[in-house]
UniProtKB/Swiss-Prot annotation:
Pathway the protein acts in: Carbohydrate degradation; glycolysis; pyruvate from D-glyceraldehyde 3-phosphate: step 2/5
Name of this protein: Phosphoglycerate kinase 1
Gene for this chain: pgk1
Keyword presence, Cytoplasm: yes
Phylogenetic lineage: Archaea, Methanobacteriati, Methanobacteriota, Stenosarchaea group, Methanomicrobia
Entry's family note: Belongs to the phosphoglycerate kinase family.
Length: 412
């Protein structure tokens, strides 16, 4: 019977025998791709290399998704297998199906040290449904595949906020453990989640305002933050909530992205948690590519907000430097444009000086990489939206499924 590592309520790869075993490994290779099917950013694939290298004496079958139905990047995983081969220095074979007879035969023929990547899991319709683990265990995917394996490893923290069959279904029918990346994410984020030192400061920006407004609500509800520093589109929503006239072009952006309902939610949060949510004092407008800094009550109607201003940068930086815990998610401005990366750069430098620093989100990590700040952060999360969901204390079905398996198998 497996035994949990002390202090953990799930099993890790150290807790089970993996040598020459048949391993089903859920990874997240979902990456930005160009129109020709080339992968533009290899960080997702690189993040799983530690796990793959530790399984060199096993027979490994990987599952991943790419894009969503209807998206331009909703495509096969052939390019991912080729890139994984290059990065790993070992052959990763691509199988253009998931659980057909052909795919199952390919799995059965694997020898020790072989690695196979199955087709995009979202090509299977039921993968796109969020259901309870016991329901997912009855899907064709799980029923066809699970008899071919000895162990299921979930290394895909970044999709573990979803209750999809490739994430939770196999935990009902196979010995199930966390991969190295998964374990690192949970351990690193837990230090932030369970931090009882103050102040705890969150700098939250980017364009996904609806997601972040919910996260702000959840974090404040559980008393997890002393300050929330708003930037990006998130800040625009909160500025509108306190009656600031953000200008026609910025208001239209909020309307077009269906974020107007978030303004009323933001207004309620500002009243309920007075003094905890901080809104910019000044911003930088994009005036034909040039940076035009103005106070928030002087925003011009025809110019888009592209960054926070110098006074806000100074105030926010002070909060972050003095924090016992800092969490940075989402850029403060349009980091891709040189004129509007100042806010993101300065806040990232400040956050790195806090006692325990966490950063996540694709654009944020890219900025940290460009600034050479990787070694300055306590934990860099590859989890994207899942990392901020985890820090808000929200339910994570993929992780809960691993914990439930450990609870069942490790009973006295």
């Amino acid at each position: 019977m497996s035994q949990k590592t002390a202090g953990k309520d799930y099993l890790t790869m150290d807790d089970v025998e993996l040598d020459n075993k048949r391993i089903l490994l859920r990874v997240d290779f979902n990456s930005p791709m160009d129109a020709n099917g080339n992968i533009l950013d290899d960080r997702k694939i690189k993040s799983h290399l530690y796990t793959l290298r530790s399984l060199e004496n096993s027979r490994v079958v990987m599952m991943s998704h790419q894009g969503r139905p209807g998206d331009k990047d909703y495509t096969t995983l052939e390019a991912h297998a080729k890139l994984a081969t290059e990065l790993l220095g070992r052959k990763v074979t691509y199988e253009d199906d998931i659980f057909s007879a052909c795919a199952r035969n390919a799995i059965k023929s694997l020898e020790k040290g072989d690695i196979l990547l199955l087709e995009n899991t979202r090509f299977y319709a039921e993968e796109n449904m969020n259901r309870a683990p016991e329901e997912q265990a009855r899907t064709q995917m799980v029923r066809k595949l699970y008899p071919l394996f000895d162990v299921f490893i979930n290394d895909a923290f970044s999709v573990s906020h979803r209750s999809q069959c490739s994430v939770v279904g196999f935990t009902e029918v196979l010995p199930s453990v966390a991969g190295i990346l998964m374990d690192r994410e949970i351990t690193g984020l837990d230090k932030g989640l369970k931090c009882h030192e103050h102040p705890a400061v969150f700098a939250l920006g980017g364009t996904k305002a609806k997601d972040i407004v919910k996260v702000i609500s959840d974090i404040l509800k559980r008393g997890g933050a002393d300050r929330i520093l708003t930037t990006g589109v998130v800040a625009t929503v909160f500025m509108m909530a306190i009656g600031i006239e953000v200008g026609e072009v910025n208001r239209k952006f909020i309307e077009d992205h269906k974020y107007l309902d978030q303004v009323s939610i933001a207004s309620r949060l500002l009243k309920e948690y007075s003094g905890k949510i901080i809104v910019p004092k000044d911003i930088a407008l994009n005036n034909d590519g040039k940076r035009e800094e103005v106070k928030v009550d002087k925003i011009k109607g025809d110019l888009p907000i592209a960054d926070i201003g110098p006074e806000t940068i100074s105030d926010y930086s002070k909060f972050l430097k003095e924090a016992k815990l800092s969490v940075f998610h989402g850029p403060a401005g349009i980091f891709e444009l040189e004129s509007f990366r100042l806010g993101t750069e300065e806040l990232l430098k400040a956050a790195a000086q806090s006692n325990y620093s966490i950063a996540g989100g694709g654009h944020t990590l890219a900025a940290i990489d460009q600034l050479g700040l990787e070694s300055k952060y306590s934990h860099l999360s590859m989890g994207g939206g899942a990392s901020i969901t985890y820090l808000s204390g929200e339910h994570m079905p993929g992780i809960e499924a691993l914990k439930n398996y450990a609870s069942r198998c490790c009973k006295d």
